[in-house]
Amino acid sequence: MLILTLLRHWHVRTKSER
């Protein structure tokens, strides 16, 4: 599912921002 991929990328981006 694309939603899953988006969620995963979003999490990674949030972690990188911190």
From Swiss-Prot:
Q: What induces it?
A: Identified when cells are grown in rich medium (at protein level).
Q: Which domain of life is it from?
A: Bacteria
The name this protein carries in UniProt is: Protein YtgB
Q: Which organism is it from?
A: Escherichia coli (strain K12)
Give the taxonomic lineage as stored in the record.
Bacteria, Pseudomonadati, Pseudomonadota, Gammaproteobacteria, Enterobacterales
